[in-house]
Design a protein with these regions (language model features):
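Glycine-aromatic micro-motifs
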Residues: 1-127
Length: 127
């Protein structure tokens, strides 16, 4: 079983959700994790932090989905010098349970470069 936590364009109803997950068997559950969420304009970014960030836990068995998300997020491998986002395994909170899931993080340096706006609510709205 693979798990990823999504907080932006991959959430249900957002632009990349159907593009990546359409036609695949997935389970979606509201969830949250710790980080710091920013609006970069057309999409969000999360950095390491202590704020609550709200999104969805997506669970699936097909490893092709993870490859598709990696490609979308510009993740080429752990600590690869040309990564856009880094993928890390973190605790994600779902109801009363805690599970490990992959989350895509952007560096603080990149967020500053794109003049990211901190979203103190921990929620990115696709608007």
């Amino acid at each position: 079983m693979h798990r990823i936590f999504v907080y932006g364009t991959l959430k249900q109803g957002c632009g990349n959700h159907h593009r990546i997950f359409g036609g695949y068997d997935i389970k979606i559950t509201p969830a949250w994790t710790y980080g710091k969420l920013y609006d970069l304009g057309w999409y969000p970014a999360m950095t390491v932090g202590t704020d609550k960030v709200y999104g969805e836990l997506i669970e699936f068995n097909n490893p092709e989905i993870l490859k598709r998300v990696d490609y979308l997020e510009g993740f080429k491998g752990e600590n690869h010098p040309h990564n856009y986002y880094e993928r890390r395994l973190v605790d994600v909170f779902v109801g009363g349970a805690t599970v490990k899931a992959w989350v895509y993080f952007l560096s603080v340096k990149q967020v500053k470069r794109y003049d990211g706006n901190h979203l103190i609510t921990g929620v990115w709205l696709n608007s």
